[in-house]
């Protein structure tokens, strides 16, 4: 798991003897089964060791490719490889099939999904259609090993499409081969072979894997005989880790996430008609991508990168003299320089200074530029003037309002005297991500809400603006504001590279620990990258903060899931002494109302991940996306604001639908103001109760319940209640659901011994265990 040579090489050497680091994701062997079906053996030693029957991986062929789920057909722990069987059906699979032995796949992450439930059922029919035989094979092996009698049916349109027959026969007691045209085996479809076995002897269970229509008819057949039948669903996915909800389906009347709850389900409970419709969600977008396939293959590597982007012009003033003062001197309220500052202006004079206004891009400009940051940053002159407003309180209540207890007066007073680098050092001493926090933290509800100015009915000091200014200044100067400490020799693992994981990594690195951060996605940053748009938090800002952690000694590994790719026990064997789980609350909530699984209704997580992380709006990338023209965003938080403002930049007419009034909106006031300036419509005191789909299964209308406010609830906000009999039906072609998130179950399901508490959060006791 450890991206740099020391850690990852040790793990690979432990699990797969002497495999070099450079061979990861290498195509070791490629075999062509038919015109469009290929078998790949790919080097992935950690996945090969940990995979089980029924698991899948997510593949990203190259940097512009979408994330594609593929079920693992086999694994060789000695060679450190996994086997995948791929059929050319879309752009990503076609790109993969064009690769040759010796080529590398950009990303392989897994094993994912819940493994097949294996026990001695008795007599089991295993039915595979087309490439479905490949994921069926490891299940056949596992069931046979458990003592079952295995009767296998493999089918294809013709002889050329029958795959893995010899391997299936090796682990089966009997095998029937079916071809549609009778060119090999018996003529007919897979259900004929299944029914032949049913008539031959008692069948305890059926496992069917293949095209969805095949699995549906298998279930209809076995349902007549009351035979339990499991199917494996290969649905649309983006992340594959339970983060987005793109793979959701109705199973037994309830919404399930295929990547977490599946991919195998009781076929009798699957809403097949819904699945068929959802599988066609991006058909038009994928067709367009396929038309430009040759352009994708031939295009030179000219992808834009923001990492070296020019810094904002605001605040790029000439640097103040570099300070040699110690951190204690920078923070000492009784230092002579600090006393002189307090004497230089009377409190009334400081109170009389007007709060600084953040320079912003005009609404007309910014809605046409998706990746340009709206807030442009303040200049040195503006920052020093705002810093003078700070009263340098002896008992600063603003610090009490900060979740990480930043010494706010000290960093602000350093700005006032022109020692910006010193201010950055004070910030970095407590906060690992000041450039991020200065942009996205809800200061008006935290530090600024405790500012003494508010007690005088004056605007709070712009602490967030000043934090951003100092952090950006340090980034531009390129100075390391925190020295790398001497190592204490203790290794700690951080699960997740979002704001929580990165902050913890920074805190531990500053204390001399050897920190290793493990991320399931292909990009470091978590929600900072997939969730927050660049017009609010540019990627290059996050990248610099990550690079600062690397300079402190932190190491990062992507495409690795703790508990699945590598277990806690294996990490303990590698010498890790502590583990921090920062996997976040990434499971999107849905409202569970009629029609919610219609095409073009997606979670804000999925929508923002496609646009932000996968850059689906860029024609150079492969991730498909449907861009609505009349978009509803459900919710009133920051994620709802990010979603509606993103949709606006993609050309939509956007309406926020929120069940309370604007006064109760949890979003930052600045985000609400920006949304209004950009032309977002607000429909407050309304709540969706049903979605209506057209004949293709795509949403076309939303039925909204009109609400009114009642008494305050536990959050202090007035509770919404429906006005009986009063509804409003509105037209829409895309709905983005942003009604909150829950803890992602992937990590608790993958790590043994974790205790779950309220709302499935991980229980942590006073002993920090």
Model-based region annotation:
Residues 20-101:
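Ferredoxin-reductase
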Residues 486, 491-495, 543-593, 690-703, ...:
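Feature captures the FAD/FMN-dependent oxidoreductase FAD-binding
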Residues 597-628, 712-769:
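FAD-site-proximal beta/loop scaffold in flavoenzymes
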Residues 91-239:
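FNR/FR-type flavoprotein reductase catalytic core
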Residues 135, 212-213, 234-264, 295-311, ...:
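Local cysteine-cluster metal-coordination motifs and their immediate loop/turn environment
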């Amino acid at each position: 798991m450890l991206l740099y040579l020391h850690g990852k090489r040790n793990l690979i050497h432990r699990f797969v003897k002497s495999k070099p680091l450079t061979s990861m994701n290498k195509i070791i062997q490629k075999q062509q089964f038919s015109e469009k079906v290929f078998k790949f053996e790919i080097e992935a030693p950690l996945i090969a060791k940990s995979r089980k029957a029924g698991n899948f991986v997510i593949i990203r062929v190259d940097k512009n490719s979408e994330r594609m789920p593929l079920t693992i057909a086999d694994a060789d722990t000695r060679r450190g490889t996994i086997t995948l069987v791929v059929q050319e059906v879309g752009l990503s699979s076609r790109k993969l099939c064009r690769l040759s032995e010796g080529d590398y796949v950009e990303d392989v992450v897994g094993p994912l999904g819940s493994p097949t439930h294996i026990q001695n059922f008795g007599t089991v029919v295993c039915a595979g259609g087309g490439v479905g035989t490949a994921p069926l094979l490891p299940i056949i092996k596992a069931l046979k090993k458990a003592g079952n009698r295995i009767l296998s049916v493999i089918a294809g349109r013709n002889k050329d499409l029958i795959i893995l027959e010899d391997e299936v026969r090796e682990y089966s007691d009997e095998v029937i081969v079916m071809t549609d045209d009778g060119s090999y085996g018996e003529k007919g479809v897979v259900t004929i072979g299944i029914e032949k076995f049913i008539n031959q002897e008692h069948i305890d269970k059926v496992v069917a894997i293949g095209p969805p229509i095949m699995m549906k008819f298998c279930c209809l057949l076995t349902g007549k005989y009351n035979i339990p039948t499991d199917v494996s669903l290969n649905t649309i996915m983006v992340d594959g880790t339970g983060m987005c909800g793109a793979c959701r389906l109705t199973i037994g009347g309830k919404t399930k996430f295929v990547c977490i709850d599946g991919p195998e389900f009781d076929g009798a409970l699957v809403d097949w008609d819904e699945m068929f419709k959802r599988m066609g969600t991006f058909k038009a977008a994928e067709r367009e991508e396929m038309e430009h396939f040759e352009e994708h293959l031939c295009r030179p590597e000219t992808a834009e990168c923001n990492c070296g982007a020019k810094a904002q012009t605001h605040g790029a003033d000439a640097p103040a003299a570099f300070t040699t003062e110690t951190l204690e001197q920078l923070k000492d309220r009784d230092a002579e320089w600090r006393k002189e500052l307090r004497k230089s202006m009377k409190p009334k004079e400081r109170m009389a200074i007007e709060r600084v206004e953040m320079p912003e891009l005009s609404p007309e400009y910014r809605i046409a530029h998706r990746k340009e940051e709206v807030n442009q940053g303040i200049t040195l002159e503006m920052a020093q003037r705002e810093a003078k407003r700070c009263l340098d309180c002896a008992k600063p209540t603003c610090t009490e309002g900060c979740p990480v207890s930043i010494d706010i007066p000290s960093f602000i007073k350093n700005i006032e005297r022109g020692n910006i680098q010193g201010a950055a050092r004070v910030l970095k001493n407590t906060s690992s991500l000041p450039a991020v926090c200065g942009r996205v933290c809800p200061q008006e509800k935290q530090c600024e809400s405790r500012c003494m100015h508010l007690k005088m009915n004056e605007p709070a000091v712009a602490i967030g603006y000043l934090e951003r200014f100092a952090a950006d200044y340090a980034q531009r100067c390129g100075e390391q504001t925190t020295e790398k400490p001497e190592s204490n020799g203790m290794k700690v693992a951080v699960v997740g590279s979002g704001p929580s994981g990165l902050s913890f990594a920074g805190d531990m690195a500053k204390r001399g620990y050897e920190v290793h951060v493990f991320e399931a996605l292909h990009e470091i940053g978590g929600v900072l990258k997939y969730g927050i748009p660049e017009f609010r938090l540019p990627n290059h800002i996050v990248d610099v903060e990550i690079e600062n952690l690397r300079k402190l000694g932190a190491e990062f590994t992507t495409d690795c899931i703790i508990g699945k790719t590598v277990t806690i026990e294996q990490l303990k064997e590698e010498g890790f002494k502590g583990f921090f789980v920062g996997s976040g609350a990434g499971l999107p909530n849905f409202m569970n109302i009629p029609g919610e699984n219609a095409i073009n209704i997606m979670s804000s997580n999925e929508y923002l991940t496609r646009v932000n992380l996968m850059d689906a709006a860029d024609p150079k990338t492969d991730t498909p996306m449907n861009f609505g023209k009349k978009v509803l965003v459900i919710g009133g938080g920051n994620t709802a604001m990010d979603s509606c403002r993103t949709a606006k930049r993609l050309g939509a007419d956007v309406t926020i639908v929120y069940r309370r009034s604007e006064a109760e909106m949890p979003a930052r006031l600045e985000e609400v103001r920006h949304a209004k300036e950009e032309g977002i419509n607000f429909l407050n005191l309304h709540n969706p109760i049903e979605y209506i789909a057209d004949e293709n299964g795509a949403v076309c209308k939303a039925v909204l319940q009109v609400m009114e406010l009642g008494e305050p609830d536990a959050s202090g906000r007035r509770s919404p209640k429906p006005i009986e009999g009063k509804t409003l039906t509105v037209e829409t072609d895309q709905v983005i659901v942003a009604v909150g998130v829950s803890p992602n179950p992937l990590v608790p399901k993958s790590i043994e011994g974790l205790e779950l508490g309220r709302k499935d959060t991980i229980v942590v006791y006073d002993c920090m265990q």
